[in-house]
Each structure stands twice: as structure tokens, then as C-alpha cells.
């Protein structure tokens, strides 16, 4: 089973000085996101797997696989809880 993550269709993203602001139109909530969070949200314009997202961070930042993976997992968990992300699973 492959799990893919994507930005919620009602999420709007704006980049400001290396960080971002996300607005969920459905809930009318704003979220501030870090530079790495902004990178992940931009990558999630199309559905991506955890491994693909880890690769996004590793390509830009000088981090270990373990740190990139834990950072990405935390981001995905938060994104699911807040409704910023949608999750697709296929066989």
C-alpha cells in the first residue's frame, strides 16, 4: 500500500521572506509555516509519498536522512490534524 499526501484543495499558500502563510478557505484558519514547511507545502501541490518529501528536504538542506524523515513525519502529522493535507492510499 502506498500513502500519498497532498495539499488540501482549499488551502492557499503565500511565501513571505522564506517562510509561509497558509489559509484554509474551508475553516478560515491561518497557519504560519517555517521555511522547510513551505518547501513541503509547495512540493505537495501534487501528491507525494513520505520518501519523496524527505528527498525534497535533503536536496535543499544539509541534514541527515533521520532528521529529514522525523521533520517530515511531524509536518505530515500536523497537516493531517489541522486539515491542511489530504491523504490518499492505493494498493
What feature does the model see in each segment?
Residues 1-38, 42, 88-90:
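Acidic, low-complexity/disordered tracts enriched in E/D and polar residues
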Amino acid at each position: 500500500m502506498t500513502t500519498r499526501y497532498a495539499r488540501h484543495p482549499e488551502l492557499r499558500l503565500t511565501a513571505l521572506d522564506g517562510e509561509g502563510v497558509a489559509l484554509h478557505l474551508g475553516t478560515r484558519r491561518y497557519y504560519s509555516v517555517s521555511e522547510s514547511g513551505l518547501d513541503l507545502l509547495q512540493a505537495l501541490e501534487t501528491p507525494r509519498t513520505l520518501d519523496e518529501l524527505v528527498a525534497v528536504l535533503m536536496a535543499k538542506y544539509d541534514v541527515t536522512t533521520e532528521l529529514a524523515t522525523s521533520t517530515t513525519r511531524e509536518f505530515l502529522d500536523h497537516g493531517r490534524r489541522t486539515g491542511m493535507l489530504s491523504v490518499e492510499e492505493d494498493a
